[in-house]
């Protein structure tokens, strides 16, 4: 395989010395970029973009043409797994993802089978291969999946939800059915991420977008337990390198100690967590990724730069920090402001790294 020209993202994940703090953005290939909107229009719709490996590759690389990012992330959607299970994913303008079929009963759960990524999601596997080839060693490629709990919420609700009423009804009234659903999803995530790794992903992230909606005990039983199972089932080394695993629970700051015990390489932090306190708690066990409020990108470039400086200072000296937003970049952000953010990370972080 082509050697990496820039491996600081992988080095920081392993808490090895770097010259500057690496940076990438969740949803860095997205609607804030005019070139993304043009490619999406050519694809016809969002699913047309996701299911075309060449176009998925094109939009994955677009932010790297604009910005000195330290990683690329596969362009896809977390809901590909339930779609592959036959639920019929579609998107309604202004309403987000929906499924033609929801999972509401024990019979619905029992009918689900663990996916076969090469057969059921060949467009994802082919997109990873295509992106990796086109990157040609420029930066590492991140693969990803949704967490079992997060996938389950969409499957049970039939789409997005504010209160997760149906999902919580199943969780509390039929916990054994919920566990069965989460188990088939965990097994599916394992084979899905391993397929991405074999196709060329050099690190993977598990997005637990809705873990923070759970109570303290329910989070451990219905979300964290399954992410720990996934981490244990992943390919640990590929192409002669360790394959780092990033766990990101939005709203999960109170569970960092338990998350660090899963065997994950790094934990994603949202912007409600104090990164200095997080490093003091778990920084000797895991790298940390985050955690600027995406809303700051609406402010002036000077204010963005100041906030980057604040977060770098809070993390402090040494490696083990991957700079990111605390959640995905939003569609209305000025691309120039995103550029100011990325440049500020590299400009201001060198002082915190004595070896490179």
Curated annotation (Swiss-Prot):
Cellular localization per UniProt: Cytoplasm
Enzymatic reactions: uroporphyrinogen III + 4 H(+) = coproporphyrinogen III + 4 CO2
InterPro entries: UROD/MetE-like_sf, Uroporphyrinogen_deCO2ase_HemE, Uroporphyrinogen_deCOase
Pathway(s) annotated for this protein in UniProt: Porphyrin-containing compound metabolism; protoporphyrin-IX biosynthesis; coproporphyrinogen-III from 5-aminolevulinate: step 4/4
Presence of keyword Lyase: yes
Keywords for this protein: Cytoplasm, Decarboxylase, Lyase, Porphyrin biosynthesis
Residues where substrate binds: 27-31, 77, 154, 209, 327
Listed GO CC annotations: cytosol
UniProt similarity note: Belongs to the uroporphyrinogen decarboxylase family.
Quaternary structure (record): Homodimer.
Name of the protein described by the UniProt record: Uroporphyrinogen decarboxylase
Gene behind the chain: hemE
């Amino acid at each position: 395989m082509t050697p990496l020209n820039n491996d600081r993202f992988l080095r920081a994940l392993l808490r090895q010395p770097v010259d500057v703090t690496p940076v990438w953005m969740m949803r860095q290939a997205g609607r804030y970029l005019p070139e993304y909107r043009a490619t999406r229009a050519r694809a016809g719709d969002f699913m047309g973009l996701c299911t075309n490996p060449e176009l998925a590759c094109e939009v994955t690389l677009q932010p790297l043409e604009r910005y000195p990012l330290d990683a690329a992330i596969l362009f896809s959607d977390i809901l590909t797994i339930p779609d592959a299970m036959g639920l019929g994913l579609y998107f309604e303008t202004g309403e987000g993802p929906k499924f033609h079929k929801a999972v509401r009963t024990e019979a619905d759960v029992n009918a689900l089978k663990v996916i076969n990524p090469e057969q059921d999601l060949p467009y994802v596997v082919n997109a990873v291969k295509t992106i990796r080839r086109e990157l040609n060693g420029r930066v590492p490629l991140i693969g990803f999946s949704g967490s079992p709990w997060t996938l389950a919420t969409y499957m049970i609700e039939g789409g997005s939800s504010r209160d997760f009423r149906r999902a919580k009804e199943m969780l509390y009234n039929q916990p054994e059915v919920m566990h069965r659903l989460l188990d088939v999803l965990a097994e599916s995530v394992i084979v899905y991420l391993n397929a991405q790794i074999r196709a060329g992903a050099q690190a993977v992230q598990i997005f637990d977008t809705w873990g923070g909606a759970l109570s303290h005990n329910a989070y451990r039983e219905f979300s964290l337990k399954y992410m720990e199972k996934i981490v244990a089932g992943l390919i640990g080394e590929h192409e002669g390198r360790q394959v780092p695993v990033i766990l990101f629970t939005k709203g999960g700051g109170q569970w960092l100690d338990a998350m660090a015990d899963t065997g994950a390489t790094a934990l994603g932090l949202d912007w409600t967590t104090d990164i200095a306190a997080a490093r003091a708690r778990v920084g000797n066990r895991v790298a940390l990724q985050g955690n600027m409020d995406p809303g700051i990108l609406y402010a002036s470039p000077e204010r963005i730069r100041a906030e980057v400086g604040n977060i770098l200072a809070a993390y402090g000296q040494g490696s083990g920090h991957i700079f990111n937003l605390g959640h995905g970049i939003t569609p209305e952000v000025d691309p120039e402001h995103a550029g100011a953010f990325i440049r500020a990370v590299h400009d201001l972080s060198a002082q915190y790294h004595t070896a490179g």
